[in-house]
A protein has these predicted regions:
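Basic, low-complexity intrinsically disordered segments
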Residues: 1-222
Length: 222
């Protein structure tokens, strides 16, 4: 405070650039072009989780906590077949719509596994979303991330229980190593030929948006 009172800033640009927050997060959001029913929105969640996992892997980050936010469409209140009678909120434009949903889940371990994150985000969406409502916006977040090296060091420092199943642990590590090789191969192909050079079956299903989003820059088409 005394330094600031005399107009002196002890924190240099070098300090600012060198600063790394102890807790980071990585997220992906999407505004759907039209209201999506539950199953179509579920497809989008799996697509987004897949790309988020690859983003983590590319940055050499891992996460142990995931969060999902779901914004419903105003159309839910005007369609009699939906018959919504829950909490209603207004958006910044004054439009009334069902209250948004929020869910989080602790994974129990740090990971950037595509298989794990797609499965866990899918479970979280099914648990959090109202299956009868139309979805308009989705946001997926890896809310607590560490770099792989730090996470590995922390794991190595943990004392292994005498009762731990060594064979199960070895099998899990082997499975993880195989997936990492697959992720590395996918990453290299996408870097060389573009993100759409290697897609999954779900990216070609009706209502999928991953392929078109890969062609966008900053949310706009190239």
């Amino acid at each position: 405070l005394i330094d600031h009172a005399w107009g002196y800033e002890p924190c240099t640009i070098k300090d600012v650039k060198a600063y790394k927050p102890s807790v980071n997060s990585l997220s992906s959001g999407q505004v759907l072009q039209e209201p999506y029913p539950f199953e179509k929105a579920r497809l989008i969640v799996k697509e987004m989780a897949d790309f988020l996992a690859m983003d983590l892997f590319e940055k050499r980050l891992v996460t142990n906590q995931i969060v999902i936010d779901i914004v419903y469409d105003a159309e839910n209140l005007s369609r009699p077949e939906i018959n919504y009678n829950g909490e209603v909120k207004e958006d910044r434009y004054g439009r009334k719509m069902p209250a948004a949903a929020h869910g989080s889940h602790n994974l129990g371990k740090f990971t950037s596994s595509t298989a794990v994150l797609v499965e866990e985000f899918d479970k979280l969406f099914r648990k959090t979303a109202n299956h009868d409502l139309l979805v308009r916006k989705l946001n997926l977040c890896a809310s607590f991330t560490l770099d792989e090296k730090t996470a590995a060091e922390n794991r190595a420092a943990e004392q292994i229980s005498f009762f731990d199943d060594a064979s199960a642990t070895a099998s899990e590590e082997e499975k993880t190593a195989k997936e990492r090789k697959r992720q590395e191969a996918v990453l290299e192909i996408r870097k060389k030929y573009g993100k759409n050079a290697m897609l999954k079956g779900m990216n070609f299903e009706q209502g999928a948006t991953g392929k078109s989003r890969n062609k966008q820059i900053g949310g706009h088409k190239e």
